Curated annotation (Swiss-Prot):
UniProt-listed NCBIfam families: pimt (TIGR00080), PRK00312.1 (NF001453)
Protein name, as recorded: Protein-L-isoaspartate O-methyltransferase
Active site: residue positions: 59
Record GO biological process: methylation; protein modification process; protein repair
Gene Ontology cellular component terms for the protein in this record: cytoplasm
Native organism taxonomy: Bacteria, Pseudomonadati, Pseudomonadota, Gammaproteobacteria, Enterobacterales
CDD domains per the UniProt record, alphabetical: AdoMet_MTases
Subcellular location(s) per record: Cytoplasm
Function, as annotated: Catalyzes the methyl esterification of L-isoaspartyl residues in peptides and proteins that result from spontaneous decomposition of normal L-aspartyl and L-asparaginyl residues. It plays a role in the repair and/or degradation of damaged proteins.
Keywords annotated in UniProt: Cytoplasm, Methyltransferase, S-adenosyl-L-methionine, Transferase
Amino acid sequence: MVNKRMQTLLMQLRQQGIQDERLLQALEAVPRERFVDEALSHKAYENTALPIGSGQTISQPYMVARMTELLQLTPTSRVLEIGTGSGYQTAILAHLVEHVCSVERIKGLQWQAKRRLKQLDLHNVSTRHGDGWLGWASRGPFDAIIVTAAPPEIPNALLEQLDEGGILVLPVGEQAQTLKCVQRRNNEFKVETVEAVRFVPLVKGELA
């Protein structure tokens, strides 16, 4: 039953323009129902965002795929994720690259995500409880940075931690939000607006 729902979801994603086969294989390999509350597991393969507690959500599969595709990952890409959340996006990234660094400001979510990833034998992820606005400078620079919550403006620390040729994908804005794709070229940043989106806000600071 789960496999049938997964295949339906993958077909929907293809129809929405997701064509990267390596990405689609990663999506197929990650059991989304393991990242949501058991009471919502029947909705795990619907193409919609779902609550995960602490005022946070697990992103819509299309948005996970779209943002990941924009990163243009190769197996050796150095990746930073801001907002571990449930760990679902983290797991997708872990199937695509050799190592993922992920920062989560809410300690409980970080712990749960770390446990889920371990249960799925995804050991190529380093998680950290910290302020996502600050990134993870000691592990940078990064070829790709993905932010799963929306700051009102692009955090300077994340731009500084982006390597030459690197790509930063994030939602930006408060009431009206847009998905931005930022590429660093010759120490200049080219910002492209991709589409209108709706994410939870990227809050500064840490929460125990």
